[in-house]
Structure formats: C-alpha cells, structure tokens
Curated annotation (Swiss-Prot):
PSII is composed of 1 copy each of membrane proteins PsbA, PsbB, PsbC, PsbD, PsbE, PsbF, PsbH, PsbI, PsbJ, PsbK, PsbL, PsbM, PsbT, PsbY, PsbZ, Psb30/Ycf12, at least 3 peripheral proteins of the oxygen-evolving complex and a large number of cofactors. It forms dimeric complexes. GO terms for cellular component: chloroplast thylakoid membrane; photosystem II reaction center. It holds the Pfam family Ycf9. This is Photosystem II reaction center protein Z. The chain crosses the membrane at residues 8-28, 41-61. It comes from the Eukaryota. It is found in: Plastid, Chloroplast thylakoid membrane. May control the interaction of photosystem II (PSII) cores with the light-harvesting antenna, regulates electron flow through the 2 photosystem reaction centers. PSII is a light-driven water plastoquinone oxidoreductase, using light energy to abstract electrons from H(2)O, generating a proton gradient subsequently used for ATP formation. The gene is psbZ.
C-alpha cells in the first residue's frame, strides 16, 4: 500500500509540474487556447483525481 501511495504522490507532483509549465504556454500562444482546450481540461481532471486518490490513500496508510 505504501508503494501505491508513493507512486500516486509522484504522479501528482509530475502532473503539477507539467501543468505549471504547459498552461501558461497554452495561454500565451496565439490560438493556443482554442486548439489545446481539451488537453488542459484533461490534465486538470487528472490532477483533481490524483489529489483525491492521494487523500484516500493517505487516510488508509495513517
């Protein structure tokens, strides 16, 4: 169970880093938002899901 928690935390950190870089780039590029809207929403949905997963796994471990 600890391995799953550590992998979920790593995935959350990696997703956060990718979103931290990609979202400003999408907003700064011309026509970037209209063509990459689905990618940003998918990344945000993945991030929210990982936050809940880390919270659930943390409550099971502690």
């Amino acid at each position: 169970m600890t391995i799953a928690f550590q992998l979920a935390v790593f995935a959350l950190i990696a997703t956060s880093s990718l979103l931290l870089i990609s979202v400003p780039v999408v907003f700064a590029s011309p026509e970037g938002w209209s063509s990459n809207k689905n990618v940003v929403f998918s990344g945000t949905s993945l991030w929210i899901g990982l936050v809940f997963l880390v919270g659930i796994l943390n409550s099971l471990i502690s």
